[in-house]
Amino acid sequence: MIKTESYVQEAAGGMVYRLIPVTEEIIRCVIGKEEIREPESLIIEKKDYPEVAFEAEEKEGRLNVRTKKVLVSLNLSEGCVEWKHADGSKWCTQNKADLTKIDVVRYTTGGEKPIINRVKTVDGERNFIQNLKTEKVREGYRARVFFDWNEEEEIHGLGQAEEGIYNYRGHNQYLYQHNMRIPMPFFVSTEGYGILFDCCSLMTFNDEGRESYLFLDTVEQIDYYFMGGGSMDGIIRDYRYLTGKAQMLPKWAYGYIQSKEQYYTAKELEEIVRHYRELNVPLDCVVQDWNTWDPGNWGEKILDQSRYGDNKECMNRIHEMHAHTMVSVWPNMNAGGKNHQEFFDAGYLLYDYATYDAFNEKAREMYWKQAKEGLFDQGFDSWWCDSTEPFSGPDWGGAVKREPWERFLMVGGEHKKYLDPAVANVFALEHAKGIYENQRKDREDMRVLNLTRSGYASGQKYAAMLWSGDTCADWENLKIQIVEGLNMGLSGYPYWTLDIGAFFTVADKWQNRGCGCNTDPEPKWFWQGKYNEGVKDKGYCELYTRWLQMGTFLPMFRSHGTDTPREIWNFGEKGTMFYDAIEKFIKLRYHLMPYIYSLAGAVHFEDYTIMRSLLFDFPEDREARKVENEFMFGPSLLVCAVTEPMYYGPESTPVDREKTWKCYLPAGTGWYDYWTNEKYKGGQYVTVEAPIDRIPVFVKAGAVIPVADGLVYAQQEPKKPIQLMVYPGADGEFVLYEDEGNNYNFENGAYAITKLVWDESAGRLNIGEREGSFPGMREAVYQTVIVK
């Protein structure tokens, strides 16, 4: 046994094991074939960890390492690792691990001129190099790590996939980057622990057969962190401790964001904002999708002057209306453009000769320089880093969806052609790093916001908001989206959203397709909406409305898609059912803004999670474990999404059914119907009214919810005092967070918190002294409303 102040190392089962206590509840386990290395990590933050008191002893063929909260016991003959509570009760067992030596190769043309097949896909224009050859660069390993889980134990997390699997027990999952897949090398257990693999290669999770294991495609060694945080919040706190705190997003990012594929001029963006202001419907951002470049210059970060020559003036007028903009940027560029040529001349392109090398710091700086000069300096406020899994093109076509294993090999293999296989899953992470770090160098007065389709562990510290990709408009997909959002939160990632209404709406009427594809009659496996006529179909209007109602309670509230427009006036006019329902929920989002922005503060300062699986707050409720279409929005609001039609099917076909919805109310607390204030006991199913203008929302007894009236943009100063809505029935508390909203002064203490404590026995709300201050701080005036 080798023991130092920071780790213990020993040979076991033909391997070398190093156990490194990081905190009292986090222990790192590194397994090497012959030696242990300390390579630089792309996902674990560099920091000086405090010394952790631990004991280590070898006894009866086992190496036992104990901190105050965790006991890890290594079987020296077999190499099995038992993870236990400090009192000896077991969490789980890592049964064994194996490392198989492989040749790590890269693909090059070997000095030949590349033979480039440029293909126009639904997901953009792509280069496919026809004469690539493999070249060995080093030796590495493929690894498997086997686990033994309790029969009733559930495994959640692993990022976002597309199948809607909530509990991964009994399932196989492929972890690779794809248009609708965002892998995370992290899972949590209902037994109260989590495991994070420091692995950036392709991975799989397998619990289908007799053995349960994770497969790591290309590594130097096995390297994982065991987190015994106990509660889900505790585990996520441990995860963020390792991977970095989530950055504060600008306050306006929590307002309503209007997007579609696509707007065509700067003036059109301005008119969208103006129309919302004229309707008095709240709005904070309008989004410019792809195709801002000159014709043929795909991915160029230079505006087409014939359509965006007045961009800066239009952006200024948008800012005068207290709104913001977001612009789409791509990592790949066509040859012939100025941006592409600059990367080519510097040698900063990957071997598809189109995509910049985001792993190169100088290349990231060049990308930022181009984006800043061509877009940021022209008035755009934030980034939409689209297609950040730039090598999934081979799967993004054809009429038949391939088998899961085939897609994994195809798309993963394409990433390994152009990236080192050890980092095949983290292009998007490095891309986000470049945007965040370089914008911060230039503009400390503007918070970074990067909406991106792919990501990885630690991306939260780069202000990267992930979204679920190009989904299809049908009710089943809406259900799946909720599950995937819950698993993303259980993966430690707090910033996730979706395309409200789904991206693709058209079924088989290809003439109505967007994305410039209305002349392509070939079926696409992913273009499988149910509504050929889009907003002209009442069935789609109902689906969109229900999607938006659920989306009101996500970290980002954003409408987007192709095939059909998404602005509110396309769903009718004021006084009609869909328009009024959409308006009601957009205004509800702003009514809740003090509550929502306080949750945003908690995400940064307290490592909180906004969209919360019921596992976070009701871990002992066995029935709550089964619920996949409900979630907590912060500590107080239970959101029950409506995921079935009640009024219309496709082609405006009337549906005859009750306008009610069955909801589960978790045990251990009382609940209020948000709309009627009717009280319910927890631990039961209830059926409540769910007409088109509302979905069931319940408030937890003891909740204190700060709200504001009359806002049309997030940073607007309320004309009336903030109301503190109290729902009696239990003691409760909430922390109101405030700051300037769009700079980084909060990092130096420029923010304020107010503790709100409801004393049930006294029937009194105690409003604490405001702690802290910041420039422009509003007067601390409140109106307390006790709900009866």
Regions found by a protein language model. Name each.
Residues 20-24, 38-48, 73-87, 96, ...:
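Extended Gly/Ser/Thr-rich low-complexity repeat segments
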